A protein has these predicted regions:
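Long, highly hydrophobic alpha-helical transmembrane signal-anchor segments
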Residues: 1-27
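Functional transmembrane core segments of multi-pass inner-membrane proteins
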Residues: 8, 100, 106, 111-177
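Functional transmembrane helices that embed catalytic/metal-coordinating motifs
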Residues: 11-20, 61, 126, 177
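Alpha-helical membrane-inserting segments
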Residues: 19, 23, 85, 89, ...
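Membrane-proximal soluble regions of multi-pass membrane proteins
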Residues: 19-74
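Transmembrane helix-loop junctions in multipass membrane proteins, especially transporters and channels
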Residues: 25-33, 91-98, 124, 150-154
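Long, charge-rich boundary regions
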Residues: 60-61, 65-135
Length: 177
């Protein structure tokens, strides 16, 4: 296994772990930055070695270290899924219709994987899509369209079609609220 593959796998699993924190804490209106992870039942504060993505769940046999209550299998599944999508993004071919730099394409792929997994989980668990993720996804998508237009000898039609598609799509979700 190449070192970059291992690095991207670990990065993806770590981002997946953050997605788990995001999904859990945003629904409870808690900070996603401050505060340590705790067992939801006994409030035991997890040590750093209990927070290693994927690995800790298996080492703890899917149970809290203190009270032995089951920890949902969803945690390592989300971490593995995110790691898998990051690896897929790493080895996918860059977009075929532009000379966009490879690093930008990869970075955008990682960000979009994060947004798609987060929104999918929010929708599955709470039937709710947080505006701070959907709106930032919209801005990132439009920024990408603008950059692709610039790298495609500034084909303004491409950017305008992306802008109109974003407007129609976002309007659809606003109407559904």
């Amino acid at each position: 296994m190449e070192l970059k593959t291992l690095f991207i796998f670990i990065l993806g699993a770590s981002i997946g772990s953050f997605i788990n924190v995001l999904i859990y804490r945003v629904s409870l209106k808690k900070s996603i930055v401050f505060g340590s992870s705790k067992c939801p039942k006994c409030e035991y504060q997890l040590a750093w070695f209990d927070n290693i993505p994927i690995l800790s769940w298996f080492l703890l046999l899917g149970k809290c270290r203190k009270c032995k209550v089951n920890i949902s299998i969803n945690y390592p599944i989300v971490e593995l899924l995110t790691a898998f999508l990051f690896i897929l993004n790493l080895y996918s071919k860059p977009t075929f219709y532009t000379d966009t730099p490879l690093l930008w394409s990869r970075l955008l792929g990682f960000i979009l994987a994060f947004i798609c997994i987060s929104l999918s989980l929010f929708d599955l668990r709470y039937f709710w899509l947080p505006n701070f993720i959907t709106f930032n996804g919209l801005l990132i998508g439009l920024s990408n369209s603008l950059l692709l237009s610039i790298y495609s000898n500034f084909d303004l039609k491409f950017f305008l079609s992306s802008l109109s598609a974003a407007f129609i799509g976002y309007s659809f979700f606003l109407i559904l609220r």
